[in-house]
Amino acid sequence: MAATNIWAALPAKKRPLHQRARRPAGGRGREPEVPFTTDPSGNPAGRNCLEFLPPGGTSGCSATDGGATVPLALRPFLRERRPLGSQHPCPWHYLQVSDYDDSLAPTCFRAHLHRRGSSSTLNQASAMTDPNPRTAEASGLYTYSSRPRAVACQRRRHRDSILQPVEEPMSYGNIMYDRRVIRGNTYALPTGQVPGQPDPLELQRQQQARRRALARKRAQEQLKPRTPEPVEGRKHVDIQTELYLEEIADRIVEVDMECQTDAFLDRPPTPLFIPAKTGKDVATQILGGELFDFDLEVKPMLEVLVGKTIEQSLLEVMEEEELANLRARQYAYEEIRNVELAEVQRLEEQERRHREEKERRKKQQWEIVHKRNETLQKISALIFARQYLANLLPSVFDKLRNSGFFYDPIERDIEVGFLPWLMNEVEKSMEHSMVGRTVLDMLIRDVVERRINDYEHKEAMPPGQKTNVINGPNTVTDPSVTTLHTQKPVLDRVSSQPAPSQERKPVEEGGHLMAE
């Protein structure tokens, strides 16, 4: 706060740029307005600007009604004045054209350009520009409202010639030797660079930069002192030769400083805004019965109320009658609608029956046609088969008859049922006869073998013993007894033989023996 007050005490021209630029957008400060004297001798030192009117007043201004001698209490321009484009003494007679030009174009805005505020502002502006000093004295302190405008940029967008060196060497060159200038035919110009391919100039520039970096690195390596190469079998190793701990002998000067700032004060409450009173208060007294006579004024009101009441009653009665008529019509319509719905249902049912009958008859007719087609197909197939098989059936029947497919049932029954039984019975009887024959043959064979054995034994004995043997007491001459003794082993031997056909050979052998 102290620094701000110091800069505020200095003239506007001697303030720094950042202090001069901190102004509100309206162009006026918030400090209290203090009337300035019109005496040029009262200006502070170093202020060479046209902030005050000349002693003789202004000459020829339509906005200020000619040469006014009234001292203005506040300067219209709060920032440092620039050289005016015109020598007109009116402070409202100049307007800045642009931020890039220091000169001001001489213009003059009429009073309606400055009257953008309320009626009080207009009165104050008229009092400020009134040439009569009594009016200004009667109004006392006045306020000034300027035309809103954008804040001027204090920083220049282009450097001044002061900041540039005075003697700057000028570089000259022939533009025809510039690589960016193309010489030759316009139709033989090189085509544009294909997207995706690097620029040859850029590649050349990168290669040159890479070569320069390699050359610089090679030169640095050559200039840098090197340690001799180690002998064979050894290698260089970095070793710490400096001290690990270093004593800090420098004493740092320490100074203690302290600063106490003022405590923050609470923001005072904002005062209420009370606008200035612009109108006049006027009072009028009206006594009772002067403006309103009840007996006279109540008649139209009663007429309106009674008329509206009767009209509303009539409307309600008409509405009730209309509702009754609507209900009667609705009932009649409901009856007609029910009758029509019943008729519609009857017609729908009739249509449904007709449709079902139609579908049934169509199905029946389709079945008849289908059966007729099947019958025709069968008849045609039968006729075709008869015609085709007329010459084929006799030969087929003959072959089947010859093959045994067509036979006499009685003959087949005899062949299948009777003949096999007869053959079995014959075979059984033959088997029994064969068994009897076999038994008989075996008995005869046994007897013959015994006799042969006896005969051979007799021939081998001396002559005196032959009679004893033949006529001895133990000699059995009855053949039946011999047969009874030998019947059992013969029967056992016959039962062990399987078939009579196999016994033919022994029978034949027995026959031969018997023949012998």
Curated annotation (Swiss-Prot):
GO cellular component, one term: radial spoke head
Coiled-coil regions listed in the entry: 333-369
Compositional bias per record (Polar residues), positions renumbered to this chain: 120-129, 465-486
Major location category of this protein: cytoplasm
InterPro entries (alphabetical): Radial_spoke_3
Keywords per UniProt: Cell projection, Cilium, Coiled coil, Cytoplasm, Cytoskeleton, Flagellum, Phosphoprotein
Region of interest called Disordered, as start-end residue ranges on this chain: 1-45, 120-139, 190-233, 459-516
Compositional bias annotation for Basic residues: 12-25, 208-217
UniProt feature, compositional bias: Basic and acidic residues: 218-233, 502-516
Taxonomy, superkingdom: Eukaryota
Signal sequence region: none
Chain's role: May function as part of axonemal radial spoke complexes that play an important part in the motility of sperm and cilia. Functions as a protein kinase A-anchoring protein that scaffolds the cAMP-dependent protein kinase holoenzyme. May serve as a point of convergence for MAPK and PKA signaling in cilia.
Quaternary structure, from the entry: May be a component of axonemal radial spokes. Interacts with IQUB. Interacts with phosphorylated MAPK1. Interacts with MEK1. Interacts with PKA regulatory subunits PRKAR1A and PRKAR1B. Interacts with RSPH1. Interacts with RSPH4A. Interacts with RSPH6A. Interacts with RSPH9. Interacts with CFAP61. Interacts with LRRC23.
Protein name, per record: Radial spoke head protein 3 homolog A
